[in-house]
Amino acid sequence: MRRFDAAALFTAMDAQRVARGMTWEQVGREIGVSAATIQRARRGGRMEVDGMLAMVGWLGVPVETFVRDSEH
């Protein structure tokens, strides 16, 4: 079975955000979601697939970068 590694996504997003000298509000505007939505998802809250895909797209990497094999 495969799963999406949200923790790895947010680690990568945070590194990119810092490298670009951006706030979470600025990131949210570029992605098209609120900073509160990003923060909620970072804390383990639910997020729509479209939002997650937008976050991956913002990083400019394939979604497979964050897909992991899981046990059971």
Regions found by a protein language model. Name each.
Residues M1-Q26:
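A short, Lys/Arg-rich alpha-helix, primarily the initiator
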Residues E30, W58:
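Residues within the alpha-helical elements of helix-turn-helix
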Residues G32-M47:
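Recognition helix of helix-turn-helix/homeodomain-like DNA-binding domains
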Residues Q39-R40, L53, V67:
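Key DNA-contacting residues within the recognition helix of helix-turn-helix
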Residues G44-G57:
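Short, basic-rich loop-to-helix N-cap that marks the start of a DNA-contacting helix
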Residues G60-H72:
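Short C-terminal boundary/hinge segments that cap the last helix of small helical domains
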